UniProtKB/Swiss-Prot annotation:
Annotated keywords: Amidation, Amphibian defense peptide, Antibiotic, Antimicrobial, Secreted
Localization in the cell: Secreted
Top-level taxon of the source organism: Eukaryota
Function of the protein: Has antibacterial activity against the Gram-positive bacteria S.aureus and E.faecalis and the Gram-negative bacteria E.coli and P.aeruginosa. No hemolytic activity.
GO CC aspect terms: extracellular region
Name used for this protein in its record: Phylloseptin-H1
Similarity field: Belongs to the frog skin active peptide (FSAP) family. Phylloseptin subfamily.
Biological processes annotated in GO: defense response to bacterium
Positions bearing Asparagine amide: N19
Tissue spec. comment: Expressed by the skin glands.
Length: 19
């Protein structure tokens, strides 16, 4: 599960950067 957290943060970060 801990391995999923960084991936989710990376996705949110990419979305925020794109926006």
């Amino acid at each position: 599960f801990l391995s999923l957290i960084p991936h989710a943060i990376n996705a949110v970060s990419a979305i925020a950067k794109h926006n």
